[in-house]
């Protein structure tokens, strides 16, 4: 039953990822007073890319070729492990905070490395920026997760959500502050404005994706959309776990609808925020991200002093 639910979660995330990326395009168009594409346009784009031939630079190595399937596999694996439809993780080995951090770091490393490997100047700069973003994002994520892990007594995402939904936490203030910091870090991880530095359209022309085409580009776009859904699910599983049944069963079908509604609300909020700001200068990103680190550290201090 667990493996069936895990596969179902992965397939649902794969199916809805283009919908949520299309939703972001629709919100951008409406806020820019344009008609914009259909909300289903990303599905059509993926179908077109899958039908096109693929061209690979003769200067690139195997890294560029294995990166799209690796990125897709990591996103699917994390979707299988997170407690999306119930308060229990279908595959706890993939639902641990440390495992998730390392898996995201692995996909990010190969994503950046493929940009450098492609011998394209834009892709190389995009890869370097991707690594810089990881340095700026991961400290706040780690500190916020470590704070909640101390409060809940476990690094398992399902256990964290169960403690929070029942109110069985030793420091409510610390959990709230950690949630604020983690929400901000997740927003940065989504690559929304002003933090879309690696694929900055006006500057780097899609960055590490510049040398991909055909099925590889389709696979990569799908994987990046899945990663966004996984990151949103990661946040909701810990800090907004309400509406999910405690056990795996038929009620998981209703919970799947609740999960999709949560994701819809989160993506709408992120879409509005993204189109309400402009892209930050690359050199001042650190000034913005360190504020999030400060909030996460403050949450940890509250746990230490017992507030």
Model-inferred region functions:
Residues 54-57, 76-91, 111-120, 150, ...:
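Transmembrane alpha-helix boundary signature
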Residues 299-307:
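Juxtamembrane boundary at the C-terminal end of a transmembrane helix
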Residues 269-296:
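Interfacial loop-to-transmembrane junctions
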Residues 45-63, 121-125, 208, 212-216:
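Cytosolic juxtamembrane amphipathic/interface segments immediately preceding
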């Amino acid at each position: 039953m667990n493996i069936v639910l895990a596969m179902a979660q992965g397939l649902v995330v794969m199916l809805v990822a283009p919908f949520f990326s299309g939703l972001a395009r629709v919100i951008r168009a409406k806020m820019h007073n344009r008609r914009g594409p259909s909300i289903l346009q990303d599905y059509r784009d993926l179908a077109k890319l899958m039908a096109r031939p693929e061209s690979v630079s003769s200067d690139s190595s195997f890294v560029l070729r294995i990166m799209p399937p690796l990125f897709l596999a990591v996103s699917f694996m994390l979707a299988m492990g997170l407690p999306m439809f119930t308060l229990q993780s279908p595959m706890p080995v993939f639902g641990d905070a440390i495992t998730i951090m390392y898996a995201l770091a692995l996909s990010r490393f190969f994503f950046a490395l493929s940009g450098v490997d492609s011998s394209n100047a834009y892709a190389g700069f995009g890869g370097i920026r991707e690594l810089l973003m990881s340095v700026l994002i991961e400290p706040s994520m780690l500190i916020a997760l470590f704070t909640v892990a101390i409060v809940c007594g476990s690094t398992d995402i399902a256990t964290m959500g169960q403690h929070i939904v029942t109110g069985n936490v030793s420091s409510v203030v610390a959990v709230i502050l950690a949630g604020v910091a983690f929400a901000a870090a997740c927003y940065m991880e989504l690559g929304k404005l002003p933090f879309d530095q690696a694929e900055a359209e006006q500057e780097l022309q899609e960055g590490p994706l510049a040398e991909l085409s055909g099925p590889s580009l389709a696979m990569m776009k799908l994987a990046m959309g899945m990663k966004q859904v996984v990151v949103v699910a990661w946040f909701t599983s810990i800090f907004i776990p309400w509406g999910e049944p405690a056990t795996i069963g038929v009620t998981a079908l209703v919970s799947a609808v609740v999960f999709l509604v949560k994701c819809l609300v989160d993506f709408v909020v992120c879409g509005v925020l993204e189109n309400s700001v402009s892209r930050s200068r690359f050199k001042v990103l650190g000034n913005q991200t360190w504020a999030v680190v400060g909030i996460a550290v403050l949450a940890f201090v509250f746990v230490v002093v017992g507030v």
